[in-house]
């Protein structure tokens, strides 16, 4: 990325001009919204609505959704201190979260939820099916990187749009999911995939 920055400065041009010029006037972005409970989340959603934000990623209990689904009393005996996720409770709570959000704010906002690859693939299928009635813009990182083959099961069993890729590192991880149309949105960090050049190759794959 630094080399592209140097090239742009030497040419006296922003990178988008080096790449051939801009192709759109703007792009939608989402903001993260959380809260200690449903009411606080809806208050925060209203705040973003007034700012003109149209896409929101919703979690309950703070960034990443903690303590939603947290059940430390079930931690294995002798386990390290920390947070332990009850997948079944997390699924129930998340479905209830979006049910109540839609009941309170309607369907004008585009909503996103990030699973953070924290549940088993079979549970991800159950969660996705449970969230279908609430018209999510996408469900992000529903399966772990090591189990991407489960995206086929998701595609076959649910209509919810899927985003994946936050932890992608190399082309072998995204070629199949793109070629087989197993996801609707690819979500990568440019620094994670190797910089601007690999990201451009991914864009035109």
At which residue positions do the language-model features occur?
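Anionic group-transfer/hydrolysis microenvironments
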Residues: 7, 59, 116, 142-143, ...
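Secondary-structure boundary/capping positions in well-ordered alpha/beta enzyme cores
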Residues: 14, 108-109, 134, 161, ...
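Short, flexible active-site-proximal loops enriched in glycine and acidic residues
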Residues: 10-22
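Metal- or metallocofactor-binding catalytic centers and their adjacent structured scaffolds
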Residues: 1-13
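Metal-dependent enolase-superfamily TIM-barrel catalytic cores that perform enediolate-based chemistry
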Residues: 26-27, 31-157
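Alpha-helical scaffold segments in soluble metabolic enzymes
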Residues: 5-6, 17, 47, 100, ...
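Catalytic alpha/beta core domains of metabolic enzymes, predominantly
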Residues: 146, 150-151, 155-205
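Ligand-binding pocket scaffold of soluble enzyme catalytic domains
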Residues: 10, 28, 32, 205
């Amino acid at each position: 990325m630094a080399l592209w920055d140097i090239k742009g400065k030497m040419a006296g041009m922003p990178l988008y001009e080096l790449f051939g010029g801009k192709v759109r006037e703007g792009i939608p972005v989402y903001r993260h919204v959380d809260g200690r409970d449903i009411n606080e989340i809806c208050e925060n959603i209203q705040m973003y609505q007034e700012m003109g934000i149209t896409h929101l990623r919703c979690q309950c209990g703070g960034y990443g959704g903690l303590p939603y689904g947290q059940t430390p009393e079930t931690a294995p005996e002798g386990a390290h201190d920390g947070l332990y996720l009850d997948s079944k409770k997390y699924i129930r709570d998340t479905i209830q979260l979006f049910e109540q959000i839609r009941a309170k704010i309607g369907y004008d906002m585009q909503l996103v939820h990030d699973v953070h690859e924290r549940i088993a693939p079979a549970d991800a299928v159950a969660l996705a099916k449970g969230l279908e009635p609430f018209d999510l813009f996408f469900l992000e990182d529903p399966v772990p990187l090591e189990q991407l083959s489960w995206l086929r099961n998701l595609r076959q069993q649910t209509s919810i749009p899927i985003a994946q890729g936050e932890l992608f590192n190399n082309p072998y991880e995204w070629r199949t999911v793109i070629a087989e149309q197993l996801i609707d949105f690819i979500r990568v960090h440019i620094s994670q995939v190797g910089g601007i050049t690999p990201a451009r190759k991914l864009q035109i794959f």
